[in-house]
Amino acid sequence: MYRRESAGDYRVVDRWHRGVGWQAVPEEDGLRTSHAVRAPDGGVWLVDPLDAPGVGDVYADLGDVVGVAVLADYHARDAAAFAERHDVPVTVPTGLDRVTERIDAPVRRVTDSLAGFDLRRVSPLRAWTETVAYRERDRTLYVPDVLSSGAAFTVGDERLGLNVLARLSPPREAFADIDPDRVLLGHGDGVFGDASDALDDTLGNARRRLPRALVSTAPRELRAMVDAVR
């Protein structure tokens, strides 16, 4: 599901006027995706970054990197390497405790906001916590894990797939007042067209689609979760 050897040719995704994304290992089923986002003050934040040769060229034209952020307990990825490269700490929201033990770099804690994004905690399971980030000024939503867009995680015509373990009790409260123009994801290409409708469809039909998800996506999602803790 996830390839652990050194990355080769990365793939650029999710480019818009205030950010860009990349997949360091685009051929893997898990489609781990990283992002560089420009903050309102002009500084650039790297979110859940995964390294690849020359990947700095992807975000070089956005501005100077002022921080590295990790927004999920299983997304330590290459945050420490990027923090050292850009001489910045790794910023982690409160409530994410597992990941700090796996980051070999200075860690700074935040609570409610980061780079103009409001932060909201989502915890589908006791051992699974992540932080959803939404920036109202440009209606950008970032979801690390609980939503994804890859074919391995979606059901039918869904453009956003909700993790099968969250379908019985979907985290609607965390997304209740969010109306995104774009949804960036920690796994898969972002959703840029009719993003709000795609989000509403996924959350509103999560339980109804659970039986299909148990057959079509659950085996792959289980492999992904097992692989993530290695």
Role assignments for model-derived ranges:
Residues L50-P93:
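Active-site metal-binding motif and surrounding structural segment of the metallo-beta-lactamase
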Residues G63, A115, I178:
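Structured loop/turn residues at beta-strand edges in well-structured enzyme cores
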Residues E27-D29, L50-P53, A72-H75, L125-A127, ...:
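Short beta->alpha connector loops
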Residues Q23-G67:
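Pre-active-site segment of Zn-dependent metallo-hydrolases
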Residues L31, P53-G54, D73-D78, D97-T100, ...:
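Active-site environment of divalent metal-dependent phosphoester hydrolases
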Residues L46-P49, V66-D73, T91-T94, Y142-D145, ...:
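Active-site neighborhood of phospho(di)ester-bond hydrolases with catalytic His/Asp-centered motifs
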Residues Y2-Y10, D14, G21-W22, E27, A81-E84, V88-T129, E136-D138, N163, ...:
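Metallo-beta-lactamase
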